């Protein structure tokens, strides 16, 4: 996965990355007035995910502060598509309360990643600690090819 932001929509999407299924938003850079609610929710809706590959596994880490593990779903779709989704509900308002500021976001999020052929999708594990979701996908062992030297005659 490229660490350089895409020219088509910043770091959240990269049209050249075969593993990313995030959609390019052609209207993202247009400055069209939107509701203040959608702008405030964008930090939650556009959940950032880091993906690294080690010798043994693919490891994805998502910052999802304020959610319980019961509010987050991790699933494999269509054999090789990892989907991370969740929802934070709006806090109930008491009509007698006076709000001075509302910065915490609410809403739904969903991120999808196409897993490579060497991923053991039947052994995926997920854990959540301190608002960070970690998904570990073990890799198939790379078969070492048998090398047989051929003598050159002549």
From Swiss-Prot:
Family: Belongs to the small heat shock protein (HSP20) family.
Annotated source species: Glycine max
Protein name from the UniProt record: 17.6 kDa class I heat shock protein
SUPFAM superfamilies cross-referenced by the UniProt entry: HSP20-like chaperones (SSF49764)
Localisation: Cytoplasm
Domain sHSP, first and last residues per copy: 40-154
Keyword set, alphabetical order: Cytoplasm, Stress response
Subunit composition and interactions: Forms oligomeric structures.
Pfam short name (any one): HSP20
GO cellular component terms, semicolon-separated: cytoplasm
Record GO terms (molecular function): unfolded protein binding
BP GO annotations: protein complex oligomerization; protein folding; response to heat; response to hydrogen peroxide; response to salt stress
Keyword Repeat: no
